[in-house]
Amino acid sequence: MKVGEQIILAARKQAEGQLEVHKANIEVYRTMPAGIGEHSDVTEAVIAELDKMSSAYDRIEMIEKFFSKNDN
């Protein structure tokens, strides 16, 4: 694998990892909202996590669109 391909793969893996972290955080809010002391507004906290998920997902889509191995 070429260095450029490794960089793109690393960027994709980082975005995938961030996506999973934020999904897990939302699951914590969904299953234990009373147990999150520093977040009195769970809805706002979930919206913030969704925004972070959106950013990571957008990066994955950009990588697929512009740096896919299936480019013609």
Language-model features: where?
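Extended, charge-rich alpha-helical interface modules
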Residues: K2-N72
